[in-house]
Curated annotation (Swiss-Prot):
Protein name in the entry: Early endosome antigen 1
Matches recorded under PROSITE patterns: ZF_FYVE, ZINC_FINGER_C2H2_1, ZINC_FINGER_C2H2_2
Subunit structure: Homodimer. Binds STX6. Binds RAB5A, RAB5B, RAB5C and RAB22A that have been activated by GTP-binding. Interacts with RAB31. Interacts with ERBB2. Interacts with SAMD9 and SAMD9L. May interact with PLEKHF2.
Documented effect of changing F1365A: Strongly reduces phosphatidylinositol 3-phosphate binding and endosomal location
Keywords: Coiled coil, Cytoplasm, Endosome, Membrane, Metal-binding, Phosphoprotein, Zinc, Zinc-finger
Signal peptide: none
Zinc finger feature spans (FYVE-type): 1352-1410
Gene it is expressed from: EEA1
Primary role: Binds phospholipid vesicles containing phosphatidylinositol 3-phosphate and participates in endosomal trafficking.
PANTHER family recorded: EARLY ENDOSOME ANTIGEN 1
Impact reported for C1405S: Abolishes phosphatidylinositol 3-phosphate binding and endosomal location
Membrane topology: Peripheral membrane protein
Gene Ontology BP terms: chemical synaptic transmission, postsynaptic; early endosome to late endosome transport; endocytosis; modulation by host of viral process; synaptic vesicle to endosome fusion; vesicle fusion
Subcellular location: Cytoplasm; Early endosome membrane
Amino acid sequence: MLRRILQRTPGRVGSQGSDLDSSATPINTVDVNNESSSEGFICPQCMKSLGSADELFKHYEAVHDAGNDSGHGGESNLALKRDDVTLLRQEVQDLQASLKEEKWYSEELKKELEKYQGLQQQEAKPDGLVTDSSAELQSLEQQLEEAQTENFNIKQMKDLFEQKAAQLATEIADIKSKYDEERSLREAAEQKVTRLTEELNKEATVIQDLKTELLQRPGIEDVAVLKKELVQVQTLMDNMTLERERESEKLKDECKKLQSQYASSEATISQLRSELAKGPQEVAVYVQELQKLKSSVNELTQKNQTLTENLLKKEQDYTKLEEKHNEESVSKKNIQATLHQKDLDCQQLQSRLSASETSLHRIHVELSEKGEATQKLKEELSEVETKYQHLKAEFKQLQQQREEKEQHGLQLQSEINQLHSKLLETERQLGEAHGRLKEQRQLSSEKLMDKEQQVADLQLKLSRLEEQLKEKVTNSTELQHQLDKTKQQHQEQQALQQSTTAKLREAQNDLEQVLRQIGDKDQKIQNLEALLQKSKENISLLEKEREDLYAKIQAGEGETAVLNQLQEKNHTLQEQVTQLTEKLKNQSESHKQAQENLHDQVQEQKAHLRAAQDRVLSLETSVNELNSQLNESKEKVSQLDIQIKAKTELLLSAEAAKTAQRADLQNHLDTAQNALQDKQQELNKITTQLDQVTAKLQDKQEHCSQLESHLKEYKEKYLSLEQKTEELEGQIKKLEADSLEVKASKEQALQDLQQQRQLNTDLELRATELSKQLEMEKEIVSSTRLDLQKKSEALESIKQKLTKQEEEKKILKQDFETLSQETKIQHEELNNRIQTTVTELQKVKMEKEALMTELSTVKDKLSKVSDSLKNSKSEFEKENQKGKAAILDLEKTCKELKHQLQVQMENTLKEQKELKKSLEKEKEASHQLKLELNSMQEQLIQAQNTLKQNEKEEQQLQGNINELKQSSEQKKKQIEALQGELKIAVLQKTELENKLQQQLTQAAQELAAEKEKISVLQNNYEKSQETFKQLQSDFYGRESELLATRQDLKSVEEKLSLAQEDLISNRNQIGNQNKLIQELKTAKATLEQDSAKKEQQLQERCKALQDIQKEKSLKEKELVNEKSKLAEIEEIKCRQEKEITKLNEELKSHKLESIKEITNLKDAKQLLIQQKLELQGKADSLKAAVEQEKRNQQILKDQVKKEEEELKKEFIEKEAKLHSEIKEKEVGMKKHEENEAKLTMQITALNENLGTVKKEWQSSQRRVSELEKQTDDLRGEIAVLEATVQNNQDERRALLERCLKGEGEIEKLQTKVLELQRKLDNTTAAVQELGRENQSLQIKHTQALNRKWAEDNEVQNCMACGKGFSVTVRRHHCRQCGNIFCAECSAKNALTPSSKKPVRVCDACFNDLQG
């Protein structure tokens, strides 16, 4: 086609064709302006010039296809370009074909005129029997003028379409360039975002390291205070170590029990998660079902359009034969029987519809039940919130108890201080050690200074990093602005695409108008063929009349009268012809107006349908977006699970580290306490020995000799004591080393305390946000609180009841072991049951696969049935066409068709019965599967109940445990926090599910409204079709009646020549179309490869997502898939039944049409017989007239015999004249007979040629129908590709939205980081202030401890005002600080910790006590 266009129009059209070819190339880098200047065809990759399009195609396949195959992944972006180019090519080719046909039609009309004029001149007779056919010439000239005007209009349309094609090519090139630019910008932005995220992560790690270093930094004052407190802590730790060892053993046992309980609770939580995960999966299944329904609606609309087109074609073929014979009683009876059968089929379909409605009702009931279950879960969560509030109140009570215990601890510290005064003697010995410690303190202070310098440097680095962060934030804002701009550009491109689609639709409407005009011309051709047949019959009648006239002329009877009669008849016929032509023109104009009105209505309805389809596509995009949201929520849930696991692991590791540190500290404290006890025992022994020695000295002063001996012994003992003191000094050194280790451990403990404080603050913040928790945990917490109350009461009597509790502990351990064994047995039973259910599910899978194989066989059978029906349709059409060609053989072919149709109907009925049986079997199997699934669900419910019972028993066992402390409470709090996070995620899930359900209901309502609109449009369309049929029937009936009067003998030969030329042109067009089909096939193959690769990519992504979700919901997916497959089977069944009913209706209509044709032929035979009888009557009348004339001649002969003698001479002369005239007439008759023989030979040859031409025309029509089918298939594929393009665009939009969401989340995280940094700074400042206050209080406390009662002799003046003491000015001691004051300076009284009543106090102490 492109070669012909280039040959015909070398100027403008050639350039446009090159532009089109250049736009069809898949490379974006070639310029359009350069292509318009180049001659011939240029390869877009190697820029090689070629002579034709075929050479270019071969060159591209041979040279460049290999490279394209290797990088085939990049061709996915070129699918849109190829689709646009193929559409433009098809439009241009259709326009060129229509132009060719109309040119050929105008040329053939000219040829017909010339031939007609030549034949008219040849057949002009000397006798003047045939008159001029001026009216027909005028009509032909009018037709010529109309054809020329139409040709001119079509040329203008062609020019417009070519201009549009050029504009579209330029627009496509611009769009491609914009797309490439945006793609490069997007890639650059993505790279920047990845770099920024990496830098942010690095900076976050640096910030965390700095924070840890800041937390580990101790202050100078802290070190001093800690060193002062070491002695006090040692005494406290000595007393508490024994109790903690015992409690640690108990807590270890309880920890094991709690771990087992925690495992059971995690199992229950996992079950609840799986149950909650069912909800969104079922929603996804329903969304898939909606998508399938939408696809089925689209398929039905496409099928409806194809059927309407086929019906229009068939109606145009058979309306002529249907309207001639309306009085057929047999056909009416058959129609009534078919209507009865259709009523029965409709009843069956209604029953099936009712069954489907019941199934839908069941599904709605199930959804309502699930909604009730979600409401129950919400109620349970509200109950959990109330219980959580109770737990908060109990937690506050426990905090109060803790404060009371701390006060008790302060009292104990006061007692320890009293003991500390007794140990001053030992502190003298430790003075040397303190000197060493001072040196170490100096060293540590120097190290601290160095660390502070390092911290300052790090703070500078932090400030710099913060500035860099601010710069990066500004960069990110700029990137966001760029993304907004790209979004706006994308929206503009979408608007351009919509405008292009509107233009393409306008072009399609124009093409449909052109095709409609071509169809009208085809109908005119068929009418002319009918006129040919009628003209043949008229020729035969005229020949007979001609023979009769010659006979009369030979007889010599009234030549002038005959001529006058013929002239009168000709005048009357001409007048009738003119009147009929005028009527025809009026009716044709009215018919054209009606057709145009109907066409406008049909286009409006099509526009409505397209708008409905666009809405359906928009709904599908919304459903896809909801699916993407669901997937994102699932990914978030999985991330939360991963975070929870990581946090639990961190908690376990921290607990293990804490236990190890506690064990080390306890060991050190044990060793220190043992050493101190040994020293105290030795000191006691020494004191007792000294007392004994003094008593003996007083009693035995007289015995000096004995004393000397005793002194020697004491010297020896003294030496041993010195050795012991040396040993004690070594032990003191060891204690100093132990004290250093204790200091290090204490620093670690302080760091742990700070971390725990931070954790506590985090937990408090979470506790304010969390409002719902599980009932099981609340019961556990309540039981533990009761136990703690009992423990607080029983702490005082623990030392006496240790033995009893150990025995009880052994008994409880035995009970617990027995219970754990029972639970293990129950778990094993549950595992066995689960295994049995898994095996049963595998069996169900096998049965499902068997059902799928049966379904595939059924589908194959259905496809075979449809193929057989199509074949029968094609055979039926062939036989109808043959019946038109050969009228005499119609009866036999109709009988054969009836027999074949009956056989086919029987076969189809049998196959339908078999299909119904197989479908019933499948229904029974599906029912059995449903029953089995219900039984499995009941078993699962029973297993869950047993698990709940086991959990209740475990709760009862937990109530019997009596001793739990701070470690268990911390673990429970952490677990509660984690569970609160889980519940928040569950609430988010439920909210998403509710939103999705609302959106689904809205989508269903919109679909129902659109379906109603489509049904209304279809009803309007059917009504318009009925009116169109009626108008066509009236029009064709009147045309047939008017055209029957025409007697066009000479038009037959001209039309035969036209038909031959038509065949030649059709063959050429078929060859061109075959080439185009091959090109389209290649394009289709490439597109299929692209689509296959895209599908593979999509499948890989789907597999990656499915692998994540398979572990949670395999069983549920299988059940839902089976349900959806059953629904699909039912839908397929309904579709097949509808198609079968449609095919039956078409077969019945074909039958009725064939019967009508037979009756028409019979009527035509009867008309011919009547005409024969009329001619025979005329011949008999002529014979009677001849006999009468013979009688008259005999009478005249008798008279002539009398006058013979008189008139012999005259008679002889007249006879001679007559003989000469008769000879001349015989010669003329012989010539006329020879001409008639020649004409008959020519007519027979033409008839034979006409038969062959008709056969070839029928074959060409078949080929044309096949080509139309192929074009329809290609259009369907183009529509599918457009849908894929739209899906790709929707995916791109979704990705952009995800990017924007991710950026928004990044901004939120940045804000959160800044808030957390501020909180951290505030908390660190608060901790530092608390430390300073603690230090000041400790200093004051140490000062208060170090105060002494001042002696009267030492103080002679008031220590406040400086007055001197005398007899009148007395001394007064302050009962708080112990200093001496005058009466005025110590006039105030206040309560002190050491007295219950107010006591004399100085002004300074009074202010301190009250401040």
